Design a protein with these regions (language model features):
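Solvent-exposed, non-transmembrane regions of integral membrane proteins
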Residues: 1-641
Length: 641
């Protein structure tokens, strides 16, 4: 996929020969060399004892030594593969990988321009590279968000972002690339930040290669839930990385003396000063992320035993929240500053109304939505509040700049529109990640999960799972939920129909979570169902269920009880109130019936009536069971002693 997109981009680059002039030669040299290196990954040739690549077309009998493969008709004994993991059977996984790999492939073009510029000692490529760099950042960002959408819908990581090393591997190149775009803009206007632009455009591609090494080498096996295992190509992957890293940095250091920039210092009130600050903040953010992600690499190289953070998400969040605050503010004020210098009077005049509107909107957000995240202390909670204000400021200030300063001209508003989109995403992340609420708190004291599920399943916390019985309305937070029925389709996917009814109104809706039979015959995999509102989403998924296709092995636990006595069960007591003799007047005269009149009382004080009995008809004795579905109880009258 990477090689395919690389070929497509290479063909497009070739059409720019007349426009780019001599620059095209250096760019195509790098693009072609990258393509050759990619091609070696799928060659599958042995050079002495070294295997170069792994061919996707190799036959099973050429790779394995199983005796059955010596038979000419061995294919009739080979069954189809198990296919995709059930969690990957999602429409987002059809479009996410192609878009993401297009983003990876596109980082080659800015890198190729940087290499060509260093080789030729020319810096006139900045105008040509900018559209490619913005395209690359846009596509790579889109691919990342598609992956987030998949994680959000499938709830594989408890949300759309979990700071998993494989997620970080795509985010870090994007951060550095965006930093490079901003320093490139500075160079075009002022002739400064040239060295930083070379560094950032080079690193964006090299970090893609490093990310490939991390995810494909198996080194992240203990820290990532969806990294690949060792594919037997570690030496080649490392060589692929070093063959670009060493020459590029060697060439960059060698050419530093030729990268001339004006010696004058930027004014603190200038746009270029704060653009550079923002670029450096993005770069430092990337450094922190990749450093934490690379802990297994450091341990491997230096023989250390540095432990990864116990709470990886918070280890990143406690740093990145301040990055979000700074970037939110800089995207807001940056365009109100002029290149070279800005008068304080003019700046205050332009920024005054955006600040006022931001204060009003922030107050509305805090009042109607709020932030309910106190797990990490008041300091982090305060940072979240500031982050929401900063993101709101970014949206409002850029909207004001677009309509007041640019008079609503879309052609001139690329930066404003981009910043509005980015800060809207930032605001959504801060609000949604800070307001996760569990509706299904289990207050019964009965865990619906097996012990191994409760410990190992990230969605298997017993306190966050309640048992629903068919046809029984159950309290769940702001809603009363009824499990109405379930259906099974032809692909072994079982859908559960759940009716949610708001307690304070008559509003109700249906959700259909499903479970899909695991293709390795190891149980089921859950897919959530969701209800989307403008300000919230409600997710529901099935952690476990009673498979009616299997034999019920539940056994009764006998108890001896007298009238007025009570016995305990896991969630309360069962009292025998009375014994009724032939309570049914319409019963046949030849039959005799005994019915136990019992009261089931739960820990919550809820009472249920139960009437198990025995019926003697002629010489046949029948047991009459009674079920208390809300308490998962089945009562049987066995005998009189």
């Amino acid at each position: 996929l990477w090689s395919f997109w690389h070929s497509v981009l290479g063909l497009i680059v070739m059409t720019k020969a007349k426009k780019w002039g001599k620059n095209i030669n250096g760019v195509m040299m790098v693009v072609n060399f990258v393509q050759v290196c990619l091609a070696t990954m799928i060659v599958g040739l042995y050079i002495f004892d070294f295997k170069l690549g792994s061919s996707p077309f190799i036959l099973l009998r050429h790779e394995m030594t199983w005796p059955i493969l010596s038979r000419p008709d061995y294919l009739q004994f080979v069954k189809d593969g198990t296919g995709l993991n059930t969690t990957l059977q999602n429409y987002w996984m059809v479009i996410h990988p192609p878009v993401l790999f297009l983003g990876f492939a596109s980082t080659t073009i800015p890198f190729a321009f940087a290499v060509a510029g260093l080789l030729k000692k020319e810096n006139n490529w900045m105008d040509s590279v900018l559209p490619w760099a913005t395209f690359s950042a846009g596509i790579l960002g889109l691919g990342i968000m598609m992956g987030d959408a998949w994680a959000y819908e499938s709830l594989n990581f408890g949300g759309y972002w979990a700071w998993d090393p494989v997620e970080n591997a795509s985010l870090v190149p994007w951060l550095v690339l965006v930093a490079g775009i901003h320093t490139c803009l500075i160079y075009r206007k002022k002739g400064t930040s040239l060295k930083a632009t070379y560094l950032f455009f080079g690193l964006s591609f090299l970090l893609v290669l490093y990310s490939t090494f991390l995810t494909r080498s198996g080194i992240l096996g203990d820290t990532s839930v969806h990294a690949f295992t060792d594919l037997g190509m570690n030496a080649q992957l490392l060589g692929y990385l070093l063959i670009f890293v060493i020459p590029y940095f060697g060439l960059l250091i060698y050419r530093l003396k030729d990268l001339k920039e004006p010696q004058e210092e930027d004014e603190i009130s200038s746009r270029e000063f704060w653009m550079l600050v923002g670029s450096l903040v993005l770069f430092l953010s990337a450094v922190v992320i990749i450093a934490i992600t690379s802990i297994p690499v450091f341990n491997k190289i230096f023989g250390t035993k540095i432990a990864p953070p116990e709470d990886p998400a918070f280890a990143h969040n406690q740093v990145q929240i301040f990055v979000a605050i700074i970037i939110g503010i800089l995207t807001a004020i940056g365009q109100y500053l002029k290149f070279k210098a800005t008068s304080a009077e003019n700046f205050i005049k332009n920024i005054k109304w955006p600040l006022i509107v931001t204060a009003v909107l922030s107050a509305i957000i805090f009042y109607f939505i709020g932030i309910a995240y106190e797990e990490k202390g008041i300091g982090y909670l305060g940072a979240l509040y500031v982050g929401v204000v900063a993101a709101t400021f970014g949206i409002v200030a850029n909207a004001f700049y677009w309509f007041n300063i640019l008079k609503g001209k879309l052609k001139s508003a690329a930066a404003s529109v981009g910043h509005i989109g980015f800060t809207m995403v930032l605001l959504g992340i801060l609000i949604s990640s800070s307001n996760k609420t569990v509706l299904s708190w289990n207050t019964t004291g009965i865990s619906p999960l097996k012990e191994d599920n409760a410990k190992n399943n990230p969605t298997g916390n017993p306190r966050e799972n309640i048992t629903l019985f068919e046809g029984v309305e159950t309290d769940m937070g702001k809603y009363m939920v009824t499990y109405q029925r379930d259906t099974l389709d032809g692909l072994d996917k079982r859908f559960f129909e759940l009716n949610f009814k708001e307690k304070k109104s008559d509003h109700s809706f249906l959700l259909y979570p499903d479970v899909l039979k695991n293709n390795k015959m190891e149980g089921f995999s859950a897919n959530p169902s969701s209800k989307h509102y403008w300000n919230k989403d409600i997710f529901v998924y099935v952690t476990s269920f009673q498979d009616h296709s299997e034999e019920d092995t539940t056994s009764f636990k006998p108890h001896q009880i007298a009238i007025g006595d009570s016995i305990f069960y896991s969630n309360g007591t069962i009292k025998l109130d009375n014994v009724l003799i032939n309570p049914n007047p319409k019963a046949a005269s030849s039959s005799n019936e005994l019915v136990l009149q019992m009261t089931v009382t739960s820990k919550e004080g809820l009472k249920y009536e139960a009437k198990p009995g025995i019926l003697l008809e002629g010489m046949t004795l029948n047991q009459e069971l009674d079920t208390v579905k809300a308490q998962n109880l089945v009562l049987s009258f066995n005998k009189v002693v």
